[in-house]
């Protein structure tokens, strides 16, 4: 199927993950656009996972900061590669961003499910993000597909400027998986 992933499965299974620090460090050796975990776990590297070309593609989240209107302004300008997240029914309550241009292929062994503890305020906000993402899952699918195609196949300058080298990272993910299998 040419679709980025199965729509109904996404709506039912969309959830948060993080990625092992070792794997992120490995990918960053080859691609500087790969986001990374902040030192001392100041902020957890969180995202959602979609399937593409038999890979788990991790799409990282970036948080919205009320005191940083410049970041939101920049994200609005990058609407071709970023999905802005809001509370359902309240576009005046921005919750963060999905960074499609920074998505990375990740082996199953390097994905860590991130359960939500609704006693934590941050996790309550993340639940709102998840609810919103499920409501726009088709938009997420389409944007992920377009970003991948424009960067990996069409070599569109705008997408190449901001996006990870998906084909390179797929090759490195495959090598990493094989390396892990033989250890």
Curated annotation (Swiss-Prot):
GO annotation (BP), single: defense response to virus
Any Gene Ontology CC annotation: cytoplasm
Subcellular location: Cytoplasm
Keywords: Antiviral defense, Cytoplasm, Endonuclease, Hydrolase, Nuclease, Plasmid, Toxin-antitoxin system
Domain of life: Bacteria
Transmembrane stretches, start-end: none
GO-annotated molecular function: RNA binding; RNA endonuclease activity
Impact noted for substituting residue 62 to L: Loss of resistance of phage P0008, loss of RNase activity
Reported effect, residue 66 to A: Wild-type; retains resistance to phage P0008, still has RNase activity
Keyword Nuclease listed: yes
Effect of a null allele: Loss of resistance to bacteriophage.
Record annotation: effect of changing residue 71 to A: Loss of resistance of phage P0008, still has RNase activity
InterPro entries: ToxN/AbiQ_toxin (IPR025911), Type_III_TA_endoRNase (IPR053735)
EC number: 3.1.-.-
Induction (record text): Constitutively expressed in the presence or absence of phage P0008 (in L.lactis subsp. lactis strain IL1403) (at protein level); in the presence of phage the abiQ transcript level decreases while the antiQ transcript does not. Part of the antiQ-abiQ operon.
The UniProt record lists the keyword Hydrolase: yes
Effect of residue 78 to E: Loss of resistance of phage P0008, decreased RNase activity
Family, similarity comment: Belongs to the ToxN/AbiQ toxin family.
Subunit structure: Forms a triangular heterohexamer with a single 35-nt-long repeat of RNA antitoxin AntiQ.
Function: Toxic component of a type III toxin-antitoxin (TA) system. An endoribonuclease that is probably sequence-specific. It is neutralized by its cognate antitoxin RNA AntiQ, which has 2.8 35 nucleotide-long repeats. Cannot be cloned in L.lactis subsp. cremoris strain NZ9000 in the absence of the antitoxin gene; expression in strain NZ9000 even in the presence of antiQ inhibits growth in a bacteriostatic fashion. Confers resistance to 936 and c2 phages but not P335 phages in L.lactis, causes an abortive infection (Abi phenotype).
Annotated protein name in UniProt: Endoribonuclease AbiQ
Biological source species: Lactococcus lactis subsp. lactis
Biological classification of the source: Bacteria, Bacillati, Bacillota, Bacilli, Lactobacillales
């Amino acid at each position: 199927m040419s679709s980025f992933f199965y729509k109904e499965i996404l709506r039912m299974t969309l959830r948060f993950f993080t990625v092992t620090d070792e794997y992120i460090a490995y990918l960053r050796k080859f691609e500087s656009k790969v986001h990374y975990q902040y030192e001392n776990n100041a902020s957890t590297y969180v995202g959602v996972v979609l399937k593409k070309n038999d890979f788990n593609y991790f799409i990282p989240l970036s948080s919205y900061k009320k005191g940083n209107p410049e970041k939101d302004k920049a994200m609005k300008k990058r609407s071709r590669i970023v999905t802005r997240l809001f509370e359902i029914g309240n576009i005046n309550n921005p919750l963060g961003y999905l960074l499609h241009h920074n998505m990375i292929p990740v082996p199953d062994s390097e994905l860590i499910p991130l359960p939500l503890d609704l006693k934590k305020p941050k996790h309550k906000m993340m639940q709102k993000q998840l609810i919103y993402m499920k409501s726009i899952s088709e938009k997420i699918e389409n944007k992920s597909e377009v970003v991948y195609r424009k960067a990996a196949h069409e070599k569109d300058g705008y997408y190449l400027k901001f996006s990870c080298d998906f084909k390179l990272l797929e090759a490195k993910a495959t090598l990493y998986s094989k390396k892990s299998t033989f250890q």
